[in-house]
Regions:
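Bacterial N-terminal signal peptides
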Residues: 11-20
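N-terminal secretory-pathway/extracellular module detecting exported/lumenal segments
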Residues: 26-107, 111-152
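Bacterial N-terminal signal peptides that target proteins for export
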Residues: 2-12
Length: 152
């Protein structure tokens, strides 16, 4: 159990440190966004100022708390093809009929490192001027190492 906690803490620390050395971008709202990954359809960023340990435990025999729940904001920017795919997957073409309108989304997420789960607490979709196009409420908790992560 103790080895698993060390491994989880090590993975989490590695993840957070790798995030801090990535390129920084600024959104229209003035927040600093750090680049995570990109492909032909999507670019992913996170806001370092939004990362908070919302729950932690103090394992016996240690002097530092172990994060058991982390919340943060992530941003997804869309190419035309990515916007088209997102609109189709969310079945919101009646709300956003033109994929060129969809510029980016900002999601609030919760990560539970020990369970390797991630949950979208909410996500808001914007046009290029920052106008809200559509919002989605809380999603299902998903394993970060499964295909289920990409299904919603």
């Amino acid at each position: 159990m103790r080895t698993m906690m060390r491994r989880t803490a090590g993975l989490l620390l590695t993840f957070l440190l790798s995030l801090t050395v990535c390129s920084v971008a600024f959104a229209d709202d003035g927040r600093a966004w750090v680049w995570l990954s990109s492909n032909d359809k999507y670019s992913k960023f996170y806001a370092p100022a939004s990362v908070h340990v919302s729950k932690s435990v103090m394992p016996s025999g240690t002097t530092e708390a172990l994060a058991t729940e982390i919340t943060a904001e992530i941003k997804t920017s869309f190419s035309y093809e990515g916007a088209e795919e997102t609109i189709r997957n969310y079945k919101i073409n009646h709300v956003i009929p033109n994929p060129a309108q969809l510029s980016y989304s900002v999601a609030q997420v919760r990560v539970v490192p020990q369970n390797r789960t991630l949950q979208y607490l909410g996500e808001t979709f914007y046009d290029s001027a920052g106008k809200v196009l559509w919002s989605k409420g809380e999603g299902k908790e998903k394993e970060m190492n499964s295909q289920q992560f990409d299904e919603e």
